[in-house]
Every structure is written in C-alpha cells, then in structure tokens.
Amino acid sequence: MPKIYFHVDVNSAFLSWSALKALQGGSTVDLRTIPAVVGGDEAKRHGVVLAKSTPAKKFGIQTGESLFAARVKCPGLTVVPPDFDLYVKNSKALIQILNDYTPDVEQYSIDEAFLDMTGTEALFGPPLTAAHTIRRRVRRELGFTVNVGIAPNRLLAKMASDFEKPDRVHTLYKYEVETKMWPLPVGDLFGVGPSAAKRLNSCGIYTIGDLARLERDTAVRLFGSRGDTLWNYANGREADPVTKQRTRDNSYGNSVTMPRDLARPEDADATMLALCDSVGRRLRADGKTARVVTVQLVDNAFRRTSHQTTLPNPTNSTDRLYHVAIELMRQMWPQRPVRLVGVSAEKTGEDNFEQMDLFTDAARIDKQEKLDRAADALRKKFGGAAVTRATLLSPDTRKPEALSAAKEREKDKK
C-alpha cells in the first residue's frame, strides 16, 4: 500500500496565537491584520523578532532581527511579548485534534506535526478530502489556520506545506517533484540554511533542480556526506517513518527548533533555561516532582542524541532542572552545529518534600522554592508572560528568545 503522510504546520503560529488571545480578551484589533510582531521586552525595546504578521513582512521585517531594526523599518510596529504557556496550550489543542485522524502522529515542533495517514481512506476519504477536513476543523474549533502538505514521505510533505500560505492544502507526489519543487531556490530545500545556500550558489547550484540533476558522486565530492543527504532530498527521497508520539504519563517536556544552527553549547544556555522554566512550572502546577532529566539534541544532519541522568532526590525546581540539563548538554554536544534542543523531566511522583543530605544547601533550596512559588503565583494571576527571566530579554540573539522563535518556519509532551 502506498504511503501517505501529512505535514500540518500552523501559519505564523506565535503571532496567530497571540492575536487570538488578544481578541478573546476584548481587543478590537486582529494583530494578524496590522504590522505586528511577537518580540522581547516592549518597554525596553530589547530582544528579537520571534514572529511577524503578513503586513509586517511587507516592511521587510525578518524573524530573528532586533526589535530596534524592526522599528526602524516600521515605526508604528505593534510588539507583543512572547507567552510560551500560551503556545503550549494551543499546541496541545492542535495535537489533540490530529490524534483523532491517526494514531501515528509525530510532533516535530511546537507548531507542526507529521501524520502517517496510510490506510485511513476508508475512514476519512481521499487524502485531499481528509486534509481539508483537518484544516477546516482546526480553523473552526481553535480559531487559527494551518497548511497541510500531502506526500508519499515526510520530506515532501513538509516541502508541500511550505507552498502558498495561509490556510492551504498542497500535494507533492513523486511525479510532481520536477514541476513543483525543482524550480524553487535551493535555499528553500529542507535542511539548506543560508550559509549552505551561499556555498551551493558559489558552485552554480541555484535551484533545487540544479542540485537534483548533479551526479550523486559530484554532490558527495563537493559537500561530503551532507551532500549525499541533500542530493537525496532534492530528488524527493527520505525514508524515515513517522515516529509515533508516545504519551508518557510520567513525563513533562519541551523542545524547540532554533532559527539558526548553534555551534557551541553556551549558545543554547538561554533556550535551555526557558525550556526548564516551562517544564518546572508545569510540574509545580500539577504537584509533581521528577527524578530523571533527559536532554535531546538534533544536529544539522538531523542526527538525534539524548542523554539522561537520575537525580539523588526528585525535584521540580527550575534552577535544579536547568543546572542538570546544562551539564548534560555540555557532555553530549555533537561535533556538528545543533538545530533542535529539548529537555524532559521523567519518573514523576507527588511533590511531598525533598530529602536532603549533609551536602545540601538547605537555605539556597528554600530560597529557590520561594522564588518559584512567587513567580508561579504572578503568572497565574497576570498571565504566562508576567514574569520573564532577565536572561531571556537579552538583545543578544545568541540567547534566543529564539526559544519562542525558531518558528515562524520551523514538543511539548506531557
């Protein structure tokens, strides 16, 4: 039976979700219809652009650039702060809907997922019919729009979902690759970043078709093993199956795809802090502590690596989770640049008390618990963005508020 995959991608996720929240709160202006961005500290004009509206794009505003630069381009720009709790809530709602159509759902990032729809035609009709059903249901029930790509493998499904937006369904079958994908700039190929695109251009490779028509050996000679991978991608070949999103009742986790590849572990410190902050917050909200911390990294060759450690005492402290995760991340950092960072807290139990030994700094732990509780109380009363760690407001793009960013283009698990 021929395989059929869907790639479901939320259109301008963070901006759309912020717009919906504002409208539900009584705003008469839809952020999606005006020059608006999701960014850092508006009062201090710190940080970077994490997501932008279609009108903002017309001013040349780019995801990842500083808010200062964005305001130069558009002085009347509306800036709203990031709200990771809001993103997690909407992401969960999306995945809940997708799980109604197949048990094989792989959440690729907070705002996109792959579905193995093979063999579901008797239930939901032909692929195009099923895709439009999902698209319309998300818009009707959740209030935001998605693109759905349909293809015989994940790679082509993802490429298809990036065609014309928003709120569209596109196919990219093998027989359509030459006409639909090959004419695109090589920089549009999945896995080709700006630096790789420049190098390909310097070799006379400007379109995906140019790369596809190269001799395979030539691609390998020019770009090594990465050249072989990209050559296969350009020819529409990708064999990885959808990995079913396992529901782990005792696991809390988040991951994020970065807006650009990270060469050094310290480049991911702020992102890891934000992820641990979110995980710790949800553990505390549910009255849970975790004994196992797992860190996952994906490099720019799409190789996944994960390390975990068992804590001597369970915890839900953001500070403790962060320091353990940072140590793991430094131990496992791969040779190639990293494109995805994730952390999960597992083997959870009821939050009773933390057993201490002679070497435990009781005063420090007590202080951290009070800080966590105070921050949680403020967020509960005033919203998820009420308290933001200073590190995450840095204008230095090495400290990604990229957490929230990474996507306009590009897991929360519980």
Predicted regions and their residues:
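Gly/Gly-Pro- and Ser/Thr-rich, intrinsically disordered tail segments characteristic of DNA damage-repair
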Residues: 1-232, 281, 365-414
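DNA-contacting surface of Y-family translesion DNA polymerases
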Residues: 188, 196-338
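Short, hydrophobic beta-strand segments
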Residues: 113-119, 306-309, 355-361
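A glycine-rich phosphate-binding loop feature that marks nucleotide/adenosyl-phosphate handling sites
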Residues: 152-155, 234-236, 289-300, 338-349, ...
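Short, charged/polar surface micro-motifs in flexible loops or helix N-caps
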Residues: 11-13, 42-45, 300-304, 348-351
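Short small-residue beta-strand/loop micro-motif enriched in glycine and branched aliphatics
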Residues: 79, 303-307, 352-354
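C-terminal hydrophobic structural anchor segments
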Residues: 315, 320-380
